[in-house]
């Protein structure tokens, strides 16, 4: 079904993620490696890989430098960072440097399976619990959101706000359609309108900028 490389220096975690893949995606071929050099070697031998699950802190990585090296050597193979890191800025940098997703090692099994499925379907996955971590503890004025001016948010319809809120929770278009009881094609149309109205180029920019919006306040309109 799929051909996936797990690059992580912890045998127990490799075994755990291996089981997630074989249970969630039967028939998939899974390869494993424990350092960046071996990962680079395997990607050179297997350019038909569908996905690389890359640990941020295994030998040879030097943080995000290893991701950059891997993307340079294998630019056509999607790479997902799988890490215990919880810093939102690191997540943002990983996406900026070419990762198509970021999965935390503390993710429940079902969430990890869903994240991998979203990525294999061509979507970008961001951990919703981290994306929404930088809310102020006090009540913020609606004009203070770091990502968007209030007039941009006010241009969104109620349904578009609901879709954007679901996007920040890490939901795929299919999940949003189910939860809002609308067609998936309608969700795609809303997402396109959201990106246009907010003047962003892609879904990731929208999600990262909208992570600390108080949707409840806007939806009271």
Swiss-Prot record:
SMART domains: HTH_LUXR, REC. Residues 149-214 form the HTH luxR-type domain. Keywords: Activator, DNA-binding, Glycerol metabolism, Phosphoprotein, Transcription, Transcription regulation. The keyword Transcription regulation applies. SUPFAM superfamilies: C-terminal effector domain of the bipartite response regulators (SSF46894), CheY-like (SSF52172). It comes from the Bacteria. The modification 4-aspartylphosphate is found at residue 55. GO terms for biological process: glycerol metabolic process; phosphorelay signal transduction system; regulation of DNA-templated transcription. InterPro entries: CheY-like_superfamily, RcsB_transcriptional_reg, Sig_transdc_resp-reg_C-effctor, Sig_transdc_resp-reg_receiver, Tscrpt_reg_LuxR_C. Residues 173-192 bind DNA. Residues 3-120 form the Response regulatory domain. GO terms for molecular function: DNA binding. The keyword rRNA-binding does not apply. Positive activator for glycerol metabolism. Regulates the expression of qedA in a positive manner and governs the expression of ADH I and ADH IIB. General regulator of quinoprotein ethanol oxidation and affects expression of ADH IIG activity but is not the sole regulator. This is Glycerol metabolism activator. It comes from Pseudomonas putida.
